[in-house]
Amino acid sequence: MRRRARRRKVSWEHAARSYSFRMRKLPSLLLGALVLACATPPAANPSAPAPIAPPINTVETEIAPDAVADTLLADVQSLEPRILVELRYATSNNFTGAPLPGYLANRAFLRREAAEALARVERDLRPQGLGLKVFDGYRPVRATLAMVDWTERVNRPDLLKDGYIASRSRHNLGLAVDLTLIDLTTGLELGMGTPFDTFSAAAHTANAAGEAAVNRQRLKAAMEREGFVNYDQEWWHFSFSVPNPLRFDRPIR
């Protein structure tokens, strides 16, 4: 009996020591489990939103067939004949010194929605004695590629890096227009401080003083009223937005 009681006592003492040991180890075990949980990546959530698609102006954006371009692009002068058009890239009077490929006529095209908005800008300006002159609208992809080639030939990669020439332009979508204001009485362009296609900070919309600053703001305000957005590094450049834009390479004829 005494031996049995002694064994029970030893057994209880062992259990107590074992329990005490486990309790002392519990904080360490819990800490280890917490570290492991933090280090383990969460399981994929099938209901989570998909990653955001890349911007529309990427090389992955396919070029739409010419037949599609014909249905979506509109000649701005067919909607408002009083808008003046002087496509610089159809002539040698541009920074490359030669006409760009794809410019076969002095006609400015835009996506119809943008062309209609531009026509409204012209109509709003005329009571003020002002009108629009367009230097560029829709631009074939091949012309944009020719601009990039030119920067390589003349060793001016900075023009791409600094945002003055784009390798994939909203002009290719028919959703950008380069333009200025004219005085309807004289037919002359208003002073904007720099010529079109000036590749320097002087062409940044906010970098002007006196009459040039006033004229830049006149143009900007008139365009913004109809939904256009100015590119702040080029006082002449405005873009428009439509759902599901497409790139085009249809020649301008």
Each predicted region: which residue ranges?
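Positively charged n-region of N-terminal signal peptides that target proteins for export
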Residues: 23-26
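Bacterial N-terminal signal peptides
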Residues: 28-37
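Short, positively charged and aromatic/hydrophobic N-terminal segments
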Residues: 19-20
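Conserved metal-phosphate-binding beta-hairpin within the catalytic cores
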Residues: 238
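Extracytoplasmic cell-surface/polysaccharide-interacting catalytic and binding patches
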Residues: 38-137, 149-233, 241-253
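Compositionally biased, low-complexity flexible segments
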Residues: 2, 6-7
